């Protein structure tokens, strides 16, 4: 076999008949498969051992030669070579056809490739190929035209008239002769001449013909190879025949299709030998043509060939296409060994990097390792004995298993795998039972819960795989989410509840005002019952000497609660003491107001700051912030420890607290009935107004809805006031552990208005609450909304999954390729606004990006941050606080790295908080970050609350799809094509339009907009090109024609951010930038100049520059081109890799085109390397790392965590050389 890791690229082309014969190990002459009695393959049949190799390893068919020692001998009796039976997966045969046939892909595809080469319409071509008409091949000296079609009658007439002075034929034979006659050089020359004058349809057709003829000329393929003399027969193990119980056989459809071809071929041969009448031979040739068509692509032309039960047979094309095809089923993803799956449940005792694996499962997964160890320790005498011990679950094996699994991480995966955190590595711990145990903090990343979810487990086998799992994939390292750099391991439920309760303060608890010299002393007091967790106490700062205290208070006494003291012991010794859950306290020493003044009585101080302590228990959002802060200062390992301690303390405290909820915790509302009655009265008044014709139906509906909403809000506000902070339900809601005020309202107040199936609201509200119970009608009304919720979710999941797939496909080859592309371009960013609403603040857009120029203070002119510096949170805060509104940053959109991005333009890797490393697959991460929250977006197109005149604005998932697919948006805005002043806005009542005139310096443009559109400008306003004249969404295709690429990219970026942030989903700009850049990688050539590019050709921006460079160097005229924007589906199909495109969609079309062009796949992306089984060119698969040589006397580096350190050492070594 060839070693895939050795070759650089892969080329596809047309196979010549001789090539097909050279692949073959022999001709298949008979349609037989296997003998029904002996079940052995028939000679010369589709499974012949002489052609395809032996069915048994190292044994010929007749049994004369058995054993490896005869390897390579061809048996003199049966003619079978003695070799491994695996060759039956790779050896091909062929069928010699008695008449040539055309290949349906090249005749039937759109555009028809044969039709273009011969300049004949596909319809006429079909008549010739299927023997309905003759085509003139050589008119000789007659008055016939070359390539003229003649019916049977016309042909006879001309034959009678001219005899043999002309030549006309039918079928694939005729086509082949015509293709042979095509003079590519001459045709190309003529077409180029024609292009100079042609216009319209003629020009388009000429360009298409030129394209394909040029392709044939340059690729080394010959046009006549589109017609076949011999059909390859694929290896028998790829179209197997298996025996079922009961002696029947199941066979691959391909065998049926091959048998039809062979039968018809043999019949044709016989007819030709017998000199049968022409009409019979022609009919047989047509049937042979149809049989080969069905074999290659069944159903492409005419009715598909069906098997038993009228099921269309699966042809060669179908074996490649779709989710079940070769590409997606077997090449991009395979079933793997050493894996298992089971239900998951929670285990709070595990460390963050551990998972529990059931004993029987671990034994099966690590079987070979256990067997090896048993033999090594002498517990078993040989492997067979060891296997027996394991199968009988001997007592000796468990200790060995414990030792074997140490230091060997396993991977856990939960479907759907939406982002890279859905597969993480854990160290296995043996547990009883049959379920896999998961750490509660890992749930968030997996989106797992324990209501029956299942997970798959995989064992990395090679040393490299183990090392990567350990260093890069261990769960303890995945603290930050790649999509926004915020912690993904946020504590939830019990942990939040426990820590909230622990950090509450209460006046008048036992032991209030006691002062302690150390935390240990306080603990003794608690255990003796002298103080409670909620007691406000004094504590000596001397007890924690390493902590930073406010100046002058290093030896003072500060006020805190015992619970907060316990909580603070989770933090590192040298970290601030946290008394208040604020950003300020997380980054600075404790506020001096909590320290006792000299000679001040502690009770006075408690009166002073007690309320501040009572108001500040630690909520869920604060716990998340604290994780981020600890990560910022102390990095991975310490944060991981903090998380485990936080979990432990939370669970312990929520147990100690004894918080439960009962029916009596739901408060009663006294005047609910009065409020409802008042609302009913208002509704009656509105109905009366409607009946009198004072208001419209729409107004009546809107008013009724708003009356009931107001009523519900009133009740909700009352609930918020009456529930006490010590009510268990309030504690749960307030801490962020579970539930919120609206759940509360439904329990104690009223449920309010329900959704109708079509997305509106019922006017009749549900006035009952769950405590009172609903009436039958109310219950029935609530079911509509519930059902709609379920169906929406199901639809949304599919939509979102497909979006993710397209995103991954378009961005999979974006990898960090080098350190710095050296560009001096960048983009200027400012806060994204929608009207007066802040969508994304400037701060979020700066963190983790490199500056493209020095940022100066607008007041003093001093430099705040220099050029080419990666901004961290502190720098970003400084910039924003100084009042800077626009900052120029390095951006992926302006990066000059071919086939990827450089480190400087990308900036920080959000998952680690460090600068991104070379080899990081940022394209895939970007696609996952945008696709994963897709399920949280709405499916609906929102309307502007029924306000007339405002257009419907698409939001949520449909809007994201609309942007990434570059579709014409719903509610499209008219944009200005010139810079200038709004000269006039005139109404035109006759045709219900308004005329907006923009007067520019050079020309004046008028735009006619409908009455219903909201005009966004007024007379005298100055507008730039691309500015909106009416409200709505801009069509990016229009925008790119009026402005430039960068403006369009920035527009898409801002709009995608709006769609996500409106739904409360934060995604970093850089992910959207990666995808936007992929949509604008192509240009359309307007004028080819003196290059050999065709006009109108769409090509890669990099290739275009290279071609122009060559021409300019040789002193010619360069080509000009215009950027085009492609939707992600189109962009994924237009990629330079035919393997990646074929495995995405439209497989046959992609392969047809690629083979004619003789395309060369440079194997730069991830997919194409996965398909051919080569290591992917990302991370340690980058050539830089693959070609490393180990050194003998190397010292162990201090930090073996990051590839970056190793890189640095390599560089230092090179420089010292």
Curated annotation (Swiss-Prot):
Binding site for Mg(2+): 449, 451, 453
Catalytic activity: RNA(n) + a ribonucleoside 5'-triphosphate = RNA(n+1) + diphosphate
One GO MF term: zinc ion binding
Binding site residues for Zn(2+) 2: 821, 895, 902, 905
GO CC, alphabetical: DNA-directed RNA polymerase complex
Pfam families documented for this protein: RNA_pol_Rpb1_1, RNA_pol_Rpb1_2, RNA_pol_Rpb1_3, RNA_pol_Rpb1_4, RNA_pol_Rpb1_5
Cofactor detail note: Binds 1 Mg(2+) ion per subunit.
Amino acids binding Zn(2+) 1: 60, 62, 75, 78
Enzyme class at the top of the EC tree: transferase
Co-factor(s): Mg(2+); Zn(2+)
EC number(s) given by UniProt: 2.7.7.6
CDD domains reported in the protein's UniProt record: RNAP_beta'_C (cd02655), RNAP_beta'_N (cd01609)
Cysteines joined through disulfide linkages: none
GO biological process terms, semicolon-separated: DNA-templated transcription
Keywords per UniProt: DNA-directed RNA polymerase, Magnesium, Metal-binding, Nucleotidyltransferase, Transcription, Transferase, Zinc
Purpose of the protein: DNA-dependent RNA polymerase catalyzes the transcription of DNA into RNA using the four ribonucleoside triphosphates as substrates.
Annotated family: Belongs to the RNA polymerase beta' chain family.
Assembly with partners or alone: The RNAP catalytic core consists of 2 alpha, 1 beta, 1 beta' and 1 omega subunit. When a sigma factor is associated with the core the holoenzyme is formed, which can initiate transcription.
HAMAP family in the record: RNApol_bact_RpoC
PANTHER family (alphabetical): DNA-DIRECTED RNA POLYMERASE, DNA-DIRECTED RNA POLYMERASE SUBUNIT BETA
Protein name: DNA-directed RNA polymerase subunit beta'
């Amino acid at each position: 076999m060839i070693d895939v890791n050795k070759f650089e690229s892969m080329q596809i082309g047309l196979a010549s008949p001789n090539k097909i014969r050279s692949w073959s190990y022999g001709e298949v002459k008979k349609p037989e498969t296997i003998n029904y009695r002996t079940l052995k393959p028939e000679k010369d049949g589709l499974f012949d051992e002489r052609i395809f190799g032996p069915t048994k390893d190292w044994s010929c068919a007749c049994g004369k030669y058995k054993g490896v020692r005869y390897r390579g001998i061809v048996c003199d009796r049966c003619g079978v070579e003695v070799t491994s039976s695996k060759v039956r997966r790779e050896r091909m045969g062929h069928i010699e056809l008695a008449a040539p046939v055309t290949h349906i892909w090249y005749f039937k595809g759109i555009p028809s490739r044969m039709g273009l080469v011969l300049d004949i319409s596909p319809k006429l071509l079909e008549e010739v190929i299927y023997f309905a008409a003759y085509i003139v091949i050589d008119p000789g000296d007659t008055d016939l035209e070359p390539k003229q079609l003649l019916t049977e009658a016309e042909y006879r007439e001309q034959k009678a008239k001219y005899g043999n002075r002309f030549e006309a034929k039918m079928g694939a034979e005729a086509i082949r002769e015509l293709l042979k006659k095509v003079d590519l050089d001459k045709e190309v020359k003529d077409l180029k001449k024609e292009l100079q004058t042609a216009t319209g349809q003629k020009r388009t057709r000429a360009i298409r013909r030129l394209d394909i003829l040029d392709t044939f000329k340059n690729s080394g393929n010959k046009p006549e190879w589109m017609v076949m003399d011999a059909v390859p027969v694929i290896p028998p193990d790829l179209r197997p025949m298996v025996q079922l119980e009961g002696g029947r056989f199941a066979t691959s459809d391909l065998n049926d299709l091959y048998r039809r071809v062979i039968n018809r071929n043999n019949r044709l041969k016989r007819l030709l030998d017998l000199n049968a009448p022409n009409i019979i031979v022609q009919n047989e040739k047509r049937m042979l043509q149809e049989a080969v068509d069905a074999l290659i692509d069944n159903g492409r032309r005419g009715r598909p060939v069906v098997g038993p039960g009228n099921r269309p047979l699966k042809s060669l094309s179908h074996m490649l296409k779709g989710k079940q095809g070769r590409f997606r089923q077997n090449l991009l993803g395979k079933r793997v060994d050493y894996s298992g799956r089971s239900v998951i449940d929670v285990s709070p005792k595990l460390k963050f990097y551990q998972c529990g694996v059931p004993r029987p499962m671990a034994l099966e997964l690590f079987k070979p390792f256990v067997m090896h160890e048993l033999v090594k320790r002498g517990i078993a005498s040989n492997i067979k004995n060891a296997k027996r011990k394991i199968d009988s679950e001997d007592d000796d094996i468990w200790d060995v298993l414990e030792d074997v699994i140490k230091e060997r991480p396993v991977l856990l995966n939960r479907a759907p795998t939406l982002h890279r955190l859905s597969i993480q590595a854990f160290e296995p711990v043996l547990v009883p039972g049959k379920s896999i145990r998961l750490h509660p903090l890992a749930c968030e990343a997996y989106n797992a819960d324990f209501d029956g979810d299942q997970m798959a487990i995989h064992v990395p086998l090679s040393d490299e795989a183990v090392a990567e799992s350990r260093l890069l994939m261990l769960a303890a390292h995945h603290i930050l989410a790649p999509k926004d750099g915020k912690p993904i391991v946020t504590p939830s439920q019990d942990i939040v509840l426990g820590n909230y309760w622990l950090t509450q303060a209460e006046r008048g608890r036992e032991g209030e005002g006691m002062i302690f010299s150390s935390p240990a002393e306080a603990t003794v007091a608690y255990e003796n019952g002298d103080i409670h967790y909620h007691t406000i106490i004094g504590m000596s700062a001397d007890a924690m000497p390493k902590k930073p205290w406010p100046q002058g208070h290093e030896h003072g006494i500060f006020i805190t609660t015992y619970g907060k003291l316990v909580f603070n012991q989770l933090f590192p010794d040298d970290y601030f003491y946290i008394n208040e859950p604020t950003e300020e306290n997380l980054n600075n020493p404790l506020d001096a107001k909590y320290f006792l003044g000299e000679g001040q009585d502690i009770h006075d101080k408690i009166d002073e700051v007690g309320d501040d302590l009572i108001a500040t228990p630690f909520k869920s959002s604060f716990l998340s912030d604290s994780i981020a802060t600890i990560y910022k200062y102390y990095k991975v390992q310490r944060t991981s420890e903090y998380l485990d301690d936080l979990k432990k303390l939370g669970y312990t405290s929520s147990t100690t607290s004894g918080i439960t909820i009962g029916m009596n915790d739901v408060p009663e509302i006294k005047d609910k009935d009065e409020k409802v009655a008042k609302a009913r009265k208002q509704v009656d008044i509105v109905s009366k107004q409607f009946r009198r014709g004072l208001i419209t139906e729409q107004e009546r509906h809107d008013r009724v809805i708003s009356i009931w909403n107001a009523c519900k809000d009133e009740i909700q506000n009352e609930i918020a006031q009456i529930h006490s902070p010590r009510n268990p339900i309030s504690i749960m809601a307030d801490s962020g552990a579970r539930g919120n005020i609206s759940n509360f309202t439904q329990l104690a107040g009223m449920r309010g208005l329900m959704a109708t199936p079509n997305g509106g609201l019922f006017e009749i509200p549900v006035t009952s609450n769950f405590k009172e119970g609903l009436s039958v009608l109310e219950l029935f009304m609530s079911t509509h909304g519930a059902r709609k919720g379920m169906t929406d979710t199901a639809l949304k999941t599919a939509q979102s999954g497909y979006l993710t797939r397209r995103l991954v496909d378009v961005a999979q080859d974006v990898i960090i390729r080098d350190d710095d592309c050296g560009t001096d371009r960048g983009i200027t960013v400012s806060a994204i606004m929608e009207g007066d609403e802040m969508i994304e603040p400037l701060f979020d857009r700066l963190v983790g990006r490199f500056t493209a120029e020095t940022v100066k203070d607008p007041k003093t002119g001093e430099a705040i941050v220099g050029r080419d510096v990666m901004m961290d949170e502190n720098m970003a805060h400084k910039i924003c606080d100084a009042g800077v509104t626009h900052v120029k940053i390095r951006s992926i959109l302006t990066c000059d790295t071919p086939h990827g991005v450089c480190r400087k333009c990308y900036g920080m890797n959000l998952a680690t908080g460090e600068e991104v490393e070379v080899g990081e697959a940022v394209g895939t991460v970007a696609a996952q970050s945008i696709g994963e929250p897709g399920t949280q977006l709405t499916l609906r197109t929102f309307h502007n609350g029924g306000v007339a005149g405002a257009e419907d604005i698409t939001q949520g998932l449909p809007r994201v799809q609309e942007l990434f697919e570059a579709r014409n948006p719903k509610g499209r805005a008219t944009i200005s094509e010139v810079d200038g002043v709004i000269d006039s806005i005139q109404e035109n009542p006759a045709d219900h339009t308004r005329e907006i005139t923009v007067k520019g310096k050079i020309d004046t443009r008028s735009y006619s907009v409908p009455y219903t559109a909201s005009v966004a400008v007024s007379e005298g306003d100055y507008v730039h090109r691309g500015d909106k004249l009416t409200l709505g969404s801009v069509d990016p295709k229009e925008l790119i024609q009026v402005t430039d690429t960068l403006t369009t990219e920035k527009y898409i970026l801002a709009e995608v951010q709006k769609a996500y942030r409106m739904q409360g989903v934060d995604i970093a700009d850089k992910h959207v930038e990666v995808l936007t850049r992929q949509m604008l990688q192509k240009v359309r050539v307007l004028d080819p100049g003196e290059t050999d590019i065709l006009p109108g050709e769409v090509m890669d921006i990099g290739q275009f520059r290279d071609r122009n460079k060559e021409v300019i160097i040789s002193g010619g005229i360069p080509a000009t081109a215009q950027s085009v924007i492609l939707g992600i589906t189109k962009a994924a199909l237009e990629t330079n890799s035919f393997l990646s495109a074929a495995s995405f969609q439209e497989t046959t079309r992609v392969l047809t085109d690629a083979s004619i062009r003789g395309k060369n796949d440079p194997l730069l992306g991830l997919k194409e390397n996965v398909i051919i089984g080569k290591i992917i060119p990302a991370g340690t698969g980058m050539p830089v790392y693959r070609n490393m040589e180990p050194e003998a006397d190397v010292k162990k580096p201090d930090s073996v965590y990051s590839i970056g350190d190793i890189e640095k050492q390599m560089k230092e070594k090179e420089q010292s050389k």
